[in-house]
Amino acid sequence: MAAPASSHGPSEDSGCLQERKIAAEMMLVDCLTDDQELVSFEDVIVDFTQEEWSSLNPDQRNLYRDVMLENYQNLATVGYQLIKPSLISWLEQEEFSKGQKIVFPEWKLQLETKCSAFQQEFLRGNISSRMQMQTGINRGRELCDGTQYGDFFSELSPLRTDMKTQPAQDNYGCSQYRKDFLMLQRKNCAGEKLSEFSQSEETGMTPVKEKIDTQEKGFECSDCGKSFMSQSHLQTHQRTHSGDKLYEWNECGRSFINSRLAVLIETLNAKKPHRCKECGKGYRYPAYLNIHMRTHTGEKPYECKECGKAFNYSNSFQIHGRTHTGEKPYVCSQCGKAFTQHSGLSIHVRSHTGDKPYGCKECGKAFLTSSRLIQHIRTHTGEKPFVCVKCGKAFAISSNLNGHLKLHAEEKTCECKICGKAFGYLSCLNNHMRTHNAKKSYTCKECGKAFNYSTHLKIHMRIHTGEKPYECKQCGKAFSHSTSFQIHERTHTGEKPYECKECGKAFICPSSFRIHEISHTHTEEKPYKCQQCGKAYSHPRSLRRHERIH
């Protein structure tokens, strides 16, 4: 047994539950007929090989559990399941979440009585406990009173608690009626009948499990040597070696090894009438489609009042808000460290457990996060997906691209029309324009300086409080600003991203780079002028020394 796949995102939780319920109901409608023909849990189950099951991720296994439990509950509601299948018992246990192997024979109830009144009424409820069974027997005795089955129900009531200890007594009355009434079949892959009912203390009946270890498995896989009891199961297994996927899902063109998996997934997505005209993705509710369309239109309706940053989705906006409020609701129980997102806490916990679940198939190296593994894999493949839009240079890691972009930032081509200040990127210019358009409503109570954003005021306040939240792990030195901290880290890493085009000399910080560039002009350029007396200097340090005089 294994599970069907699904790719629903976290924003579709409520819709997914409705879709699973509809899928379960649709499968039951196909199974239940007007004349109450035999239906079992086996009719609405999805069978897979162990290889297929092990390839599914936790979300896909959880979807399988929800659908199968829904199917079983619906069957029980209309009375088509007498004994709880072992699969359901397994799904309800916590071993399911641990991904343990699933190998269960399925039980099928067959009702062979000719009393249609009892057949329709006795099977109305899920007869899985002694009390429910007793209620069903009483109801059956009322319906069948005066018929050839009347004596049968008289013998059944009351159910004795010592049935199991009295094998000689025939508690079910006429043995012929007992055989006609209840026959439980346990089937293997070839459909052979393997066992019948005996009595149990809990329900009055329990399946007598005959050993299947001796069953012949005459179909052996030539690739791995695994044996199967039927040709069809061998063929399905062999597709795991060949990669053949015969069953295609029409909506996205995805293929599956098992036909029932393809059918179930198509059923789960059948009720999605709201389709995206851009990519064809379907949604059950128009609200979900509207949210999805933002990925195509670029609409970002959620704007932060603190910094002006905009977001597509409300949950992203809420998480961003914590960067301003300082809220960190997810706390590590081991060390007390707090995080703004649950994913951050999950990754941090691995530092305590030593768990590195993401391993490289090429060299075996393991990583805490999938993003680190992806970056590492690029060292094997040579992939460089991060490309500079200005010069076309490509990088394997986004942080390397960001460092490279700082070189272009010195080329200040985007100029402010109000004050003449220039910027390397249009986005930086747009942020700067807010300083002209917005009111400086955040004022420092210490010195009276005003700021556009509360975050800028918080950074400024560190001058007065002496707070230095950025501490170097290498040497312990602390800084009040992140930019100063980043520049300091380069003294340990040796990174020098600012390179002179004239002589090739590289520098850690942009200020040193600008001072060096002046040395190549061979002029007495003195861009740093004193506002008090007008005296000019070629270096900012000289200007600062001069200003002390005033």
Curated annotation (Swiss-Prot):
Q: CDD domains, alphabetically?
A: KRAB_A-box
Q: What does this protein do?
A: May be involved in transcriptional regulation.
Gene Ontology molecular function terms on file: DNA binding; zinc ion binding
Designated name of the protein: Zinc finger protein 426
Q: What keywords tag this UniProt record?
A: DNA-binding, Metal-binding, Nucleus, Repeat, Transcription, Transcription regulation, Zinc, Zinc-finger
Q: Where are the zinc fingers (C2H2-type)?
A: 219-241, 274-296, 302-324, 330-352, 358-380, 386-408, 414-436, 442-464, 470-492, 498-522, 528-550
Q: Where in or outside the cell is it found?
A: Nucleus
The disulfide bonds in this chain are: none
Gene name of the record: Znf426
Q: What InterPro entries is this protein classified in? A: KRAB (IPR001909), KRAB_dom_sf (IPR036051), Zinc_finger (IPR050331), Znf_C2H2_sf (IPR036236), Znf_C2H2_type (IPR013087)
Q: Which GO terms describe its cellular component?
A: nucleus
The domain of life is: Eukaryota
Q: KRAB domain: which residues? A: 39-110
Q: Which GO terms describe its biological process?
A: regulation of DNA-templated transcription
